[in-house]
Amino acid sequence: PDTHTPAIDTDGCLNYALAKMSVRYHLPVSGVDLLSDSYTYYTTFTNQILSGSGTKMDQVADAYSAYLTREETVWLSGSTEERMEQAYTICAENSSNAGWCCILQMTTASGSDHYVLADYADTTQKRLYLLDSGSWYVEYLGDAKTLEKGYFVTAVHPFQIQKMAGDLDGDFQLTSADVELLMQNRVADPLVADANFDSTVDSADAVYLAHVVQYTHDFQMQCAMQTNVPVA
């Protein structure tokens, strides 16, 4: 989802954060996949996964119990700066665990609730980068835009991703190496090997995954051309 995708309800920012987590870790959503357009993916995910009872984070944990677990929420305290430092520290301490991710809960200057999926902790610059649905311009916690918006972090909601469909080499990324392993039939876990979620492990999984990898590469190249940042 991006800024052109309308929020379905008043918890739109939480929906965005959970949908982005679903995309990032390739969680199954019936009727859509990583090649679907953002609007269709977002609306399908929200209506399919977040339409039950209980909190939305618990609904995600229940729906994807075969792939992840929700860990205990960490509630923060202190000043705005102290809370930002605490959030960074929690994420930095887990930065070596590629399957660990978190959603930050916060309030804004207007008093509204806001949720953001953390992208990664840069331990060199000591910055916590964000995937924020609220603005194109927010990059990391504590930057000028987050201060302008008055972000006040109240909690860190961690998830531990245990399995990622299509990720055969266990690095929690979908790459050409995973495609090669699928083509070589090196399948250790059918749940991981079933990249296209059709309940069958076959060549179609490798074909789908190859399309995803190519699309991701093309998108990264496009972003690099727009920002002059080289593709890693």
Predicted features along the sequence, with ranges:
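Boundary/junction segments of secreted and surface-exposed precursor proteins
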Residues: 1-2, 163-173
